[in-house]
Design a protein with these regions (language model features):
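Active-site acidic/histidine clusters and adjacent loop/turn architecture
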Residues: 40-94
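Long, solvent-exposed, polar/charged low-complexity segments
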Residues: 22, 26-44, 48, 65-69, ...
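Hydrophobic/aromatic-rich structural module bridging two neighboring secondary-structure elements via a short loop
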Residues: 77-121
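Compact, glycine/acidic-enriched structural inserts
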Residues: 131-185
Length: 253
């Protein structure tokens, strides 16, 4: 009897390993239409009762996006040092934090994920957002610390040309259009309002954004387009990594 139980356990373990191996071989190059259908229905039925009834559907769609994220992560790790360990680990929870929100609906109506670059020398991060009518990719610095923000501004004030060169490049403009993010209406403390780079110094956030249609996200070329977009962020990330890890004389911090 014990031998039979042991054999059953071994077979179960082998089956699980086979499933994991097959999942690793799956290359999800797009976001299935079923993900959008589920999120549209969730938007119309954003309550716990509906979600409980449709929980299995949610897990199926979440798994589809996780497979896409796994495929994308595999591509990204060939050209950047990413510390995110798996596509599943990159995804954010669908449950909302409603403690400080007027909107008390319990669930997000999107599925998003982020890849974190490894080591303090590699700054910036990659974000992908799946939502009906609002798919986009993002990257950059959403909320730099006061110390980092001051250092960025000092570096830009000392020599704005490297950043201007990146922002005016054909690839940057064709991919992102312009640098996004909140800006001060007046010069930050300690900076001259007439500084020739005040348009850049006034930024509080430094964001790169590219929008996609639902149809584009469902296309087999979506993975290729996402990878190309993230690659186009690299000159900006390399610049920010350099100025955030060196002083005004170019010496390591």
């Amino acid at each position: 009897m014990n031998a039979l139980v042991r054999m059953a356990e071994i077979r179960k373990s082998i089956d699980q390993e086979i499933v994991l191996s097959l999942e690793q071989l799956v290359m999800q190059k797009h976001i299935p239409a079923s993900v959008f259908s589920f999120l549209e229905e969730l938007k119309e039925n954003n309550n716990r009762e509906w979600f409980q009834v449709n929980k299995e559907r949610y897990h199926e769609q979440y798994h589809s996006v996780a497979l896409f994220a796994d495929t994308l992560l595999s591509e990204m790790k060939q050209c950047d040092n990413i510390e995110t360990v798996s596509g599943k680990k990159s995804l954010f929870r669908i449950h909302k934090d409603v403690r400080f929100s007027k909107d008390k609906s319990p669930y997000k109506t999107n599925i998003g994920g982020a890849f974190t670059r490894a080591t303090k020398e590699l700054r910036g991060g990659y974000y992908f957002h799946i939502e009906p009518g609002n798919c986009f990719l993002g990257g950059g610095f959403w909320g730099p610390s006061p110390e980092d923000l001051k250092h960025i501004r000092l570096q830009i004030a000392a020599d704005p040309e490297p950043l201007r060169e990146i922002l005016s490049s054909k690839e940057f403009i064709s991919t992102f259009g312009k640098l996004e993010g909140e800006q001060l209406k007046t010069a930050p403390k300690g900076f001259d309002k007439d500084h020739p780079a005040i348009d850049l110094i006034n930024f509080k956030q430094f964001l790169l954004v590219k929008n996609f249609t639902d149809k584009q996200a469902q296309s087999e070329k979506y993975l290729e387009n996402v990878f190309a977009t993230f690659q186009a962020m690299r000159p900006f990330f390399d610049y920010m990594s350099e100025i955030l890890t060196t002083d005004l004389n170019g010496e390591p911090l």
